[in-house]
Amino acid sequence: MIGVGVDVVEIERFRLALTRTPSMRERLFTPVELDYVAPKVDPVPSLAARFAAREAIMKALGLGLGAFGFHEAWVEVEPSGAPRLVVTGRARELAVDRGVVRWHVSLSHDGPVAVAMVVAE
């Protein structure tokens, strides 16, 4: 195992940030992610979990926020409903440099928080 990263996002605080800066959605999330959450009655908890996943990836790699662009790592959903990380560009280069060959991700949101756990191996 290379590393583990966990991140927690306060959903209402994240909602306020998205409301205050509407362009943030497109800056932080890929079209794939935005399409996935579009039919949800309240997409913000799912978006918060996906944001947490990006930060958890950076932590799993031992890096700080801003180590790579937000569109260089994102969450897709398998036909089974399981989340799957897609890591490209600078994020992929950093992962390869550290010997990462496989990713695992778990997302959840309940009540006031969204959480993501990422394992890089």
Label the predicted regions.
Residues M1-E121:
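Core catalytic alpha/beta fold that binds nucleotide/phospho-ligands
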